[in-house]
Each structure stands twice: as structure tokens, then as C-alpha cells.
A protein has these predicted regions:
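A short hydrophobic beta-strand segment most commonly corresponding to one strand
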Residues: 106-114, 118-144
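A short, N-terminal "cap"/entry segment at the start of jelly-roll beta-barrel domains
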Residues: 1-54, 149-152
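Short acidic-glycine-tyrosine-enriched beta hairpin
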Residues: 93-111
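Short, ordered coil/turn segments that flank beta-strands lining enzyme active or ligand-binding pockets
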Residues: 19-20, 83, 92
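Short, conserved beta-strand element in jelly-roll/cupin
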Residues: 62-65, 73-89
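Conserved short histidine dyad/triad with adjacent acidic residue
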Residues: 31-34, 38-46, 56-74, 99, ...
């Protein structure tokens, strides 16, 4: 069955990125480079946005209720998707974003510099009375600087 909408979809994600001064920020971005095609013929066409990566590691984490990490940078550029529960990310510019199941974050705050309080990267932790289960896809690539919303 072929049921194709004429307008390509968009998917929102939060990009945690570092500016040229070493300060981390978050920007709400859109994945919007979709084409309609079969992922594996003869399957019917669907909207696809393929982002080629040189390699990746998939990590699952379970953050307990009340968990708060210390300020830190993401170890690699990485896609983070909550599967259940809620979590927050606070960047050095003071912005705090809370995310739940199905929302997406791209953690790319490498190369930050300590602020006046000694903070680098971001602070994150659980929100609410349930653990937060995250799926993380760590990319084996060099992080960018001063380039919000680089994935489209």
C-alpha cells in the first residue's frame, strides 16, 4: 500500500553545542531533509532522512530517580533519546530543557571552557518520580564548534 503525504515531515531535536568562546548552548533544530523512498524494496515508500556516519556505539542507560550528574561534556557527539521517564539538560548559558520519551537531543558540547563557577559542558539529571531510560548513539566523528543545527 502506498500512502504518501505530499509534504515531507520535520522532526525536532535539541542540539547542545559549543560556541567560539567555549560556552555551551541549546538550540531547537529541525531534521527536514526527507525523501520518499523504500528503505528496502519491495517495501512501500516512506519518508527517509539518511545521515551517514563513519561508525557508532549504542549505549543504554538507566538513571535512577533523583539522579543528577555533575557538570561534564558529552564524551562524543551523540544522539540521546529518552525511552521512558524524563530528564533535563542545563547548558552553561543557563538554559534548561526537559525531555521525555521520543524527544531527541544531540549532545555536542565538547571543547567547552570553564565559566566563572568552573562549570564545563552541561548538567543533566532525572525529572519526576520514575527512572529515565536513555538510548544513546555515540558518533565516531570530530565535534563541530559554533555550528548549531548542523544535522538537517
Amino acid at each position: 500500500m502506498h500512502n504518501e503525504s505530499t509534504q515531507p515531515p520535520t522532526i525536532a531535536y535539541w542540539h547542545v553545542w559549543t560556541d567560539e568562546h567555549g560556552i555551551s548552548h541549546q538550540s531547537c533544530c529541525q531534521i527536514d531533509n526527507f525523501t520518499s523512498k523504500s528503505i528496502s524494496p519491495p517495501a512501500s515508500p516512506q519518508w527517509l532522512d539518511q545521515m551517514q556516519q563513519s561508525g557508532a556505539t549504542i549505549v543504554f542507560t538507566v538513571q535512577p530517580v533523583g539522579w543528577v550528574g555533575t557538570w561534564h561534556e558529552n564524551p562524543h557527539p551523540q544522539w540521546i533519546i529518552p525511552l521512558s521517564g524524563r530528564w533535563f539538560v542545563e547548558t552553561m548559558d543557563g538554559q534548561r530543557v526537559e525531555m521525555g520519551p521520543g524527544e531527541i537531543s544531540l549532545g555536542e558540547d565538547q571543547n567547552t571552557k570553564p565559566d566563572a563557577k568552573g562549570h564545563r559542558g552541561h548538567l543533566s539529571g532525572t525529572v519526576g518520580d520514575a527512572p529515565c531510560v536513555l538510548m544513546i548513539v555515540q558518533l565516531q566523528e570530530t565535534p563541530t564548534i559554533n555550528q548549531a543545527c548542523r544535522f538537517r
